[in-house]
Amino acid sequence: MSTVLTSVIGGARVPSGAGRLYRSTDPSRTTDVVAEVSLADADDLVRACEAARNAQDAWRDVPPPVRGQVVAAIGRLVEANKAALARVVTREVGKPYAEALGEVQEIADTCAFFLGEGRRLYGHTVPSEMPDKQLFTFRDPVGVVTAITAGNFPVAVPSWYIVPALLCGNAVVWKPAEYAAACAEAFYQVFAHAGLPDGVLNVVYADGPETFRGLERALVRGLVDKVGFTGSTEVGARIGELCGRHLQSPCLELGGKNPMVVTEDADLTLAVEGALFSGFGTAGQRCTSLGTAIVHESVRDEFVRLLDEATRAATVGDPAGDVLYGPLIDERFADGFEKVLGWIGPRHAVHGSSGTGRISPSNPRDGFDGDAEAGLYYHPVIVDGVRPDDELFLHETFGPIVGVAPYRTLDEAIALANAPGYGLSASIYTTDPAEVFAFRRRISAGMVSVNNSTSGAEAHLPFGGNGRSGNGGRQSGIWVLDQFTRWQSMNWDFSGRLQKAQMDVVEITPDLGFRL
């Protein structure tokens, strides 16, 4: 790029040169620099929170239906720039272009939902137990929202925070992933041209340690009222602890070890299709990616055979083409996946490709379509025979690898599904409604799919997890409004005298001894 990207605080660019320089590269051609970014420090994050605080009062006072019109304008701009934004996503994070188009559409869908919520930020009129007295409730914005997002969904997930936060009357400080800075810049430009006042949306390009230090200082100074974080369970726990010290409850959307239960009467062709998409789509780098397929022992061998066949037939390679998945997003994720591959032991049976590890001329994959030497491409891996005490069973892998474990009874399958302690997404393939509802009732996941994959979200359905996958907060739909507003109650006594609740209530005496 011809210019260095810098943070935007209060509508103004932070001068470049002061911060460390970070180069974001194309993971399919790692020598191709997509963006050069001047990284901000902790003080910059604090300044961004100050700018948001200064802008928030005026933004709060813009009537909600008008804020909804700004959201509508964002949605129209996203649709007008859909192809261009998707191309940036494909180039910078290696997401196949068809998937990138779907991700951009998710922003537009989110805007389409929330533009109407500007006219529906309803409170309630509540009857009082006193005469000549009325009770009301109101939704008020929380204030300043700091959103910290990962780069595997570099534009869709930020919209889940930023669109409803703005709609509710909050000002936002957004810290995107530095390895997805070009995506963040394009996203910000679309939002800025929708008419947002200066300071209402601020963007801070920073690394993790500086972000944490800045957030800590901003919380101490009372500049942040809500933190949203999408990322790893380990970092989410640290952010949760930090916010807890300031009596705040963050919105945490963390990792997943998402199970798929395949019963003895399941449609195996459909189950394999779901496993292929959720296990290897986006190179397994989704929080909702399939972790372990828990398959009834009577169909396990056939399931593994079919999944192996489908995975070997799938095209992996250049994300600009028609591929199942492209490269891993960044070197840091490739290094992490190399560690995961070390968890495969001699008692495991490995399927899915002509090799394991990084695809290269010396470790080729049949049907690969791309320049293997240029990018961060990895073989898909199916590991049969994983056990509950395996590292591969217990931990999120964030790469193109799927474990398979057998079960005998549904009780055993549910116990295995819950064992890793995550609780984001779970799936069951069955034709038995009783099994569906028994599974739904006892699975720990915040999202359950029936005869569908573990991956997939819609803008009007709550998204979020429990346990190691989050603290119970939900994104999307009307449910996210509770993250970005606080309820305020008001009582208005127009009787002209003091009426004391529970003490001055009119008593009506029933004859409870009456019998027919």
Task: Enumerate the language-model features and the residues they cover.
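Rossmann-like NAD(P) dinucleotide-binding subdomain of oxidoreductase/dehydrogenase enzymes
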Residues: 123-270, 407
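ALDH superfamily catalytic-core signature
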Residues: 234-387, 450, 496-500, 506-515
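Hydrophobic face of amphipathic alpha-helices that form TPR/SEL1-like repeat modules
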Residues: 1-29, 33
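Glycine-rich loop-to-alpha-helix module at the N-terminal edge of alpha/beta enzyme cores
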Residues: 30-122, 132
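Conserved C-terminal structural/oligomerization subdomain of aldehyde/semialdehyde dehydrogenase
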Residues: 32-35, 224, 261, 312-315, ...
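Residues at or immediately preceding the N-termini of alpha-helices
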Residues: 27-28, 42-45, 64, 82, ...
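Short, well-ordered beta-strand elements within core beta-sheets of diverse protein domains
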Residues: 34-40, 54-61, 147, 260-263, ...
